[in-house]
């Protein structure tokens, strides 16, 4: 990212990483190396969670937060049958904000999280 003069770096771990200690250690190492290459980086560490996982995502988030020190979350698949009620418990339990939500598969379907609009959509959902 630095050599290509990029402002944003996304690292996809392909999920279920928290169940494998070796992979979690490797992810910690990646974070340390990024900090050495670019002092002060990473500037934010966000965990992307699938809203359809429900309350199971809280235990997953806790493990990632312990390992990496998260700054917040991105909740995906909020366009399906899942209403994303886990958002409230997740944010309360870890005291971290939801930054973005995914409501589809296209880049424009990734939206900045607006708590008021989210609650309104939950309450007035048909």
For the regions a language model picked out, list residue spans one by one.
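P-loop/Walker A NTP-binding module and the surrounding RecA-like catalytic core of P-loop NTPases
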Residues: 1-126
């Amino acid at each position: 990212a630095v050599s290509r003069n990029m402002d944003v770096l996304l690292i996809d771990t392909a999920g279920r990483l928290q169940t494998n200690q070796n992979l979690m250690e490797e992810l910690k190492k990646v974070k340390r190396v990024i900090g050495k290459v670019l002092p002060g980086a990473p500037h934010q560490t966000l965990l992307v969670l699938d809203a359809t996982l429900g309350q199971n995502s809280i235990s997953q988030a806790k493990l990632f937060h312990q390992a990496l020190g998260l700054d917040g979350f991105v909740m995906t698949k909020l366009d399906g049958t899942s209403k994303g009620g886990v958002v409230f418990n997740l944010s309360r339990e870890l005291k971290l904000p939801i930054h973005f939500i995914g409501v589809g598969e296209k880049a424009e379907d990734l939206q900045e999280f607006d708590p008021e609009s989210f609650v309104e959509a939950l309450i007035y959902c048909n």
